[in-house]
Swiss-Prot record:
One of its GO terms (molecular function) is small ribosomal subunit rRNA binding. One of its GO terms (biological process) is translation. Binds together with bS18 to 16S ribosomal RNA. Residues 120-131 have a biased composition (Acidic residues). This is Small ribosomal subunit protein bS6. Keywords: Ribonucleoprotein, Ribosomal protein, RNA-binding, rRNA-binding. Residues 96-131 are annotated as: Disordered. Pfam families: Ribosomal_S6. The keyword DNA damage does not apply. Residues 104-116 have a biased composition (Basic and acidic residues). Belongs to the bacterial ribosomal protein bS6 family. It comes from Salmonella arizonae (strain ATCC BAA-731 / CDC346-86 / RSK2980). Gene3D superfamilies: 3.30.70.60. The keyword rRNA-binding applies.
Amino acid sequence: MRHYEIVFMVHPDQSEQVPGMIERYSAAITGAEGKIHRLEDWGRRQLAYPINKLHKAHYVLMNVEAPQEVIDELETTFRFNDAVIRSMIMRTKHAVTEASPMVKAKDERRERRDDFANETADDAEAGDSEE
């Protein structure tokens, strides 16, 4: 089996359907003895340019190892699903399991925010004890 990177963008009005779509696509891959090495739901993001008069879309990234038949089926599903406004399936040489730069940056921002919240909470407690 070969390794693939799959990115698809969903219409922003259909964002609530994304978990179900991910579940269906994951079931199709694992049902054919494939493996999902990385699955990232990037959420609703700004598009670089308008597509069908839309300026935002819900992004999903998957790195999978699957047989060609499943990939062909996914490609057909993307093509005929009106909620999917763009998709890209790319063959890769190796399985990619590490977090994408997008997720790494998001985690770093979350850690900084948590550290700042902890520091301000500690400062507030120190101020209360001085009184």
